[in-house]
Amino acid sequence: MNYEETLEYLYNQLPVYQKVGGTAYKEGLDNSLSLDKYFSHPHTRYKTIHIAGTNGKGSTSHLLAATLQQSGYKVGLYTSPHLVDFRERIRVNGEKISKQYVLDFVTKHREAYEPIQPSFFELTMMMAFQYFADTNVDVAIIEVGLGGRLDSTNIITPVLSIITNISFDHMQFLGNTLEKIAAEKAGIIKKDIPRSEEHTSEL
């Protein structure tokens, strides 16, 4: 496959939430944990900061990544969705992941991950984790995709958990009250791990 064919495979062969909606959502962490085991837990090779919330998590992720980079750290950044280019999702010091890395990752490991039947998000998340390990980042900013407690990214043990503003979103998955939605997003909070939370007046 070339790069364009690789993207076509990712978009058309794996369930993508933006294309097929809720049928792409895989509740639980089993797939993520299976992928993580196969790749030998790449996220343990650098520090991580986990960011959840309804509004502001993307801008917070980019701002924090830029601040850490200016302080001299080599910084990975994983966000979603992308606006134009798939590679916007995975960056190191502001530079997008290379097309060759995307191609090699998908083709090299295809026989291992296809039996797991990962979603688009689960596989691209693991691509990011492995890329950050391969490029020896000091710290990676990891933005939650959906919710928090059962989000694919919630296999990491971060040095800091951040929850930005919370409002109604993805109610079919997270619940129909702010309290239920907040509880799902608070699922990224780990015992004895520092956290930062933005106050939501309705709660």
Residues of each region from the PLM?
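Residue-level detector of conserved catalytic or cofactor/ligand-binding positions
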Residues: 198-203
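Short loop-to-beta-strand entry elements in the cores of soluble alpha/beta enzymes
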Residues: 190-197
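ATP-dependent carboxylate-amine ligase catalytic core
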Residues: 22-29, 34-44, 70-156, 172-182
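Membrane-proximal helix-turn-helix segments that form the acceptor-binding/catalytic region
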Residues: 182-190
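Catalytic cores of secreted/periplasmic lytic hydrolases that degrade extracellular macromolecules
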Residues: 57
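Short functional linear segments
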Residues: 1-52, 60-62, 66-71
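Hydrophobic/aromatic beta-strand patches that form the interior of the parallel beta-sheet core
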Residues: 49, 76-78, 160-162, 196
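Inter-motif core of Ras-like GTPase G domains
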Residues: 154-165
